[in-house]
Every structure is written in structure tokens, then in C-alpha cells.
């Protein structure tokens, strides 16, 4: 909603007051944090690592390192070609069960390697807030255009 409001605001400005605007919209952001708030993306991975989820939801999403998101911000400030654009920042996409398998292979043996039935995800989403946002996209592939 904030992005939509920003674009709408820009449309109301006369030409003397207009300015360049770029939206950096990252997908699931992972990596080192600057504060104790680990964010939604990292909290889901932490739940996998701790074995707090018996299986993975059939969620397909994009992943990007937080440092690459920072680089995208710098890039957009230094390159006029990004002016007045909406940039989706994603390194790769995969199903969440693949993340669980990668973690398991990396030594996090509590991480689930099986996919949870969609009906069960919907029940868990009532109690686990991080899952509430994925119920509408269960089983759907999400592929992002990584070109500028």
C-alpha cells in the first residue's frame, strides 16, 4: 500500500516538483541482521532449523541475500536507468521444502525434508502467524524477472 500511495503522490506533483523515484521490492530476504529483529523470512528458516515445523508448506518463493538488497539500493541511486522503475530483487526461487532439504544436508538435522499437506498448513496458519501469509499461494510457482 505504501508503494501505491507513493506512486499516486508522484502523479499529483507538477513538473517543477517532480523527482525521480525507484522502488526496490525484495522477495524473501535472508542473511545477517543489524538488529535483534530477525524478520519474517529469517524467522521461518529459524523454525525449520529448530525443528518447530513437522514439514514444509508447499510454498514457492524467491530468495535474496540482504547484502544483495543493499547493493540494489546503491545501484539504483547511482544509475539513472532505474529512475521511476519498480525493481523486484530476487536471486533464485524454490519450494520451501527444498530449503528444508538444503538445511538438513548442511547439518541442521531437525529441519524437515517432507512437504506438508495444504489443509494442514491452513490449520497451522491459525496459530503460526508466519504461515498466515502463505495460505493463498500454496502449490503455486513464483518466478521473478531478474533483468533490469
Q: Over which residues does each language-model region extend?
A:
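Mid/C-terminal beta-alpha module of Rossmann-like enzyme folds, strongest
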Residues: 72-136
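Glycine-rich beta-alpha junction loops
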Residues: 26-31, 93
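Active-site loop of classical SDR/Rossmann-like NAD(P)-dependent oxidoreductases
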Residues: 96, 136-148
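Conserved loop-to-helix N-cap of the C-terminal "lid" that shapes the substrate pocket in Rossmann-like
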Residues: 23, 57-70, 86, 93-96
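Glycine/proline-rich active-site loop of Rossmann-fold NAD(P)-dependent oxidoreductases
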Residues: 15-19, 31-44, 76-87
